[in-house]
Structures are given as structure tokens and as C-alpha cells.
């Protein structure tokens, strides 16, 4: 084999999803307890953050000739650790028992990709995986949806910020990650379930929001968020006047107005004000307000409403990323 290290890394990276895919076993002293539903999604997310923190630390140590790159990687490592702590850590099935040395243990946390562009794409792909789970009301309650999406959106924001630091697109490593997956499949006969394969449908892509109006017409969350998006859009021209180099303001304004219109077209109650201006007009404050409006939709019991909020949040994390004074929290919550 010409590239044993790369092959080993491939196996390590892609085994993470397989290790968390949940073989349902009876709980006993000789078998791992069953891990299903939201608990399975939560642990997959936690394992991703643990792997991301480890890889970001190691890459930062190698970036000696680019101090800004090293700083961005260390920031990502810290954010990943915060998200891991927010989730409660990686699943420990025997934490309340003594003498666990001889008991079966979950798979160890696997390694994330080594190359920067592939690492970034891996972060994005895993975020979409978690957001799909968070948008499904049959597998996650509103509270669980907000918890999982808070981590996934924070991870996506970290990917966007790291891509900016290296001046590359967030999807620049998609082909490389796909190649790793193909090598893994050839070696094991299995397909990593977290990968969005090119040219093929996948359970990990976000479903499209349907055009039916019933979910939005009965959603208080959709009505409230629509008002917020419209008001933020009306405030943006004032913010642009008072903020130096806020070149993104018009683009963001148009995106928010379009989002509000699409929400109304789907049946959301129209409670917009003819004239509306927020008191806090800094780009940072407006970005936070917009993300709160997005995440608010995850309190809905409707998959369509949740999906609309998820897509809005992903759009906002990209739209606001270059605005002056704007930074994103490690965990994107309603607060």
C-alpha cells in the first residue's frame, strides 16, 4: 500500500459514524446498553466535537508559519470543547457503576480529517447530519431539537470562520472527504452514514420545506420570527450609516426581506409593522437578533417550520460572517 498513513486516517475518520450508528443490544453486564433515538444523535454529535477539538489542537501546533491560522484553529478547538461540555460529553454507559474494566466499552472517538479543506467540509457535513435530526419532530422534542441544533449551528459557524481564515470555500474539501469515504467503502464494504455523497440522494441532506401552508399558518413561532426578520431588515440601513465598512448590509437586508416574504407565502400570520427599528443597531446585535429569530422556529412541533428555521440559520451564519464586529458563539441558542 502506497499511503498506509492516509488509509489509516481514512479508517479512523470514517469509523466514527459507524461506531455511533447504534446496534440495538440487550442491556446486561456483557453487552452495551441500547443507544437509540435522540440519545444516539446526541452521542454522534458529542463524538464529532471531541474529534474536532483534538484535530484542531494538532493542526494549530503545526501552523507555526501562520499565526492567524493557528489562532483560528485554537479558537475552534475551544469552541468544540464548549459544545462537547454543553452536550454532557461522550456517552459513558457505565458511569454509575464500579469495576467497569472488564465491561464492553463504546468505540473510541475516531480522528477527524488531517487536511484543512477536508476538515472544514467534514465539520459542515456533520453539522447537516445533526440539523436533519434536530428538524425531525418524531425523533426530537422541541427542547432536544434546540440542544442539538445549538451545537450543530455552532460547529457550522466554526467551519465558516476557519474557511475565512484560510481564504477557502467551506465546500472546498468535499471531494477529498468523498474520496476518503470511497476508500473506506472499498476496504470494509460499508458506507459511512454521515456523508452526503455527490450526485446521489442521502438521508443526511436537509429535506425541502413543503409548500403547504397549514404548519406556518398555525405557528406562533413563524409569525414572531417573520416580524423579527422584517424589523431587522428595516434597521439595517441605519446600521450601515453608523458602522464603518459595513458593505454587507444591503445584501443581508434583501435576504431577510425575502425570507420574511417566503414565510408569509407559506401562510405565516402577517404581524409586521409599517415602520420598525431596533434600539441596538450594531451589526453584532442585529446578527444575534436574526439568529434568535431563526432558532425560535425550532420550538415548533412542525418539521417544515423547523426546517425553515434551520436553513435560515445556515444562511445567516454565512451572510453575517464578514460583517464588522460580528462573532458567533460556540453554541447558538435563543439567549
Give residue ranges: language-model regions.
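N-terminal export and membrane-targeting signals
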Residues: 1-13, 145, 306
Amino acid at each position: 500500500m502506497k499511503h498506509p498513513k492516509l488509509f489509516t486516517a481514512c479508517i479512523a475518520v470514517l469509523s466514527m459514524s459507524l461506531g455511533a450508528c447504534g446496534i440495538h443490544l440487550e442491556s446486561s453486564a456483557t453487552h452495551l446498553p441500547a443507544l437509540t433515538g435522540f440519545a444516539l444523535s446526541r452521542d454522534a454529535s458529542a463524538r464529532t466535537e471531541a474529534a474536532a477539538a483534538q484535530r484542531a489542537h494538532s493542526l494549530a501546533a503545526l501552523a507555526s508559519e501562520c499565526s492567524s491560522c493557528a489562532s483560528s484553529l485554537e479558537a475552534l478547538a475551544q469552541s468544540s470543547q464548549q459544545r462537547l461540555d454543553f452536550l454532557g460529553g461522550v456517552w459513558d454507559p457505565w458511569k454509575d457503576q464500579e469495576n467497569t474494566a472488564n465491561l464492553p466499552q463504546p468505540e473510541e472517538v475516531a480522528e477527524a480529517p488531517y487536511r484543512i479543506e477536508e476538515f472544514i467540509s467534514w465539520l459542515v457535513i456533520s453539522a447537516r447530519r445533526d440539523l436533519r435530526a434536530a428538524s425531525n419532530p418524531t425523533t426530537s422534542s422541541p427542547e432536544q431539537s434546540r440542544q442539538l441544533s445549538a451545537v450543530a449551528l455552532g460547529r457550522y459557524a466554526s467551519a465558516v470562520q476557519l474557511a475565512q481564515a484560510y481564504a477557502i470555500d467551506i465546500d472546498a474539501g468535499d471531494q477529498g472527504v468523498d474520496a476518503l469515504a470511497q476508500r473506506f467503502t472499498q476496504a470494509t464494504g460499508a458506507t459511512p452514514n454521515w456523508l452526503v455523497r455527490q450526485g446521489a440522494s442521502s438521508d443526511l441532506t436537509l429535506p425541502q420545506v413543503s409548500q403547504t401552508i397549514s404548519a406556518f399558518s398555525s405557528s406562533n413561532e413563524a409569525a414572531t420570527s417573520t416580524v423579527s426578520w422584517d424589523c431587522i431588515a428595516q434597521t439595517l440601513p441605519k446600521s450601515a450609516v453608523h458602522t464603518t465598512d459595513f458593505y454587507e448590509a444591503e445584501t443581508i437586508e434583501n435576504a431577510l426581506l425575502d425570507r420574511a416574504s417566503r414565510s408569509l407565502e407559506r401562510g405565516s400570520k402577517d404581524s409586521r409593522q409599517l415602520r420598525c427599528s431596533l434600539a441596538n443597531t450594531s451589526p453584532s446585535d442585529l446578527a444575534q437578533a436574526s439568529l434568535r429569530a431563526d432558532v425560535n422556529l425550532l420550538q415548533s412541533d412542525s418539521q417544515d417550520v423547523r426546517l425553515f428555521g434551520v436553513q435560515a440559520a445556515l444562511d445567516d451564519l454565512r451572510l453575517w460572517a464578514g460583517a464588522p464586529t460580528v462573532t458567533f458563539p460556540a453554541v447558538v441558542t435563543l439567549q
